[in-house]
């Protein structure tokens, strides 16, 4: 399971040209995303409440980014996803299917991909086989997203209790381990391990 259960969203000013990349910054008990958007950075600290309290997490952010950072809300969540999204006449989309970590673009991408799969492939033959195929697609898709998320925890940091505990308890999933080993296969856009559909870590990501 993924190790974090709290998110502390905030914004930072963006002066000058917008960078063409997102920063993922290791913190004492989790990591910060820093995404350049129009006129500012959208940021958030995701962390494990067993290792740091909400007030201490706010203090850590202010030490790193400045005392004026406004952080009015702490979001609590339990990471996971449903094994089935299509049961009888009910079909789940978006947060109804699960929540992994607050990666909005990845969540939107997964929702759209599920709808495309549903309408293009399975509505033409709405039977148990279509349900099973759609649920299998959903499972494979989220396994790849979990793989992608684990990359945020594979940086080698070991100077706090959170990171030491994570290293002892966590083994990188197959895809994450493969990427960290420098790429043991040629990257390709359509990943057969995701039923031939696009991966959340596509070929272009191997090049950066």
What are these regions (language model features)?
Residues 1-66, 115:
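Predominantly flavin-linked oxidoreductase catalytic cores and closely associated redox partners
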Residues 120-208:
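Long, low-complexity C-terminal extensions of enzymes
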């Amino acid at each position: 399971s993924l190790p974090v259960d709290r998110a502390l969203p905030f914004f930072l000013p963006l002066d000058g040209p917008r960078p063409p990349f997102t920063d993922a910054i290791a913190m004492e008990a989790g990591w910060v995303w820093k995404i350049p958007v129009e006129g500012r950075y959208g940021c958030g600290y995701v962390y494990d409440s067993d290792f740091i309290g909400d007030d201490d997490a706010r203090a850590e952010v202010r030490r790193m980014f400045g005392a004026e950072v406004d952080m009015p809300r702490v979001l609590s969540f339990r990471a996971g996803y449903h094994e089935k999204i299509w049961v009888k006449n009910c079909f789940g989309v978006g947060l109804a299917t699960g929540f992994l970590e607050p990666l909005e673009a990845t969540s939107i991408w997964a929702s759209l991909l599920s709808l495309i799969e549903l309408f293009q492939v399975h509505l033409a033959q709405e039977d148990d086989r279509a349900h099973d195929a759609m649920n299998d697609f959903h499972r494979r898709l989220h396994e790849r997203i979990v793989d992608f998320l684990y990359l945020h925890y594979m940086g080698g940091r070991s100077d706090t209790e959170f990171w030491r505990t994570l290293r002892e308890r966590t083994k990188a999933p197959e895809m994450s381990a493969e990427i960290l080993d420098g790429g043991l296969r040629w990257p390709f856009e359509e990943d057969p391990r995701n039923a031939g559909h696009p991966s959340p870590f596509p070929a272009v990501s191997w090049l950066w």
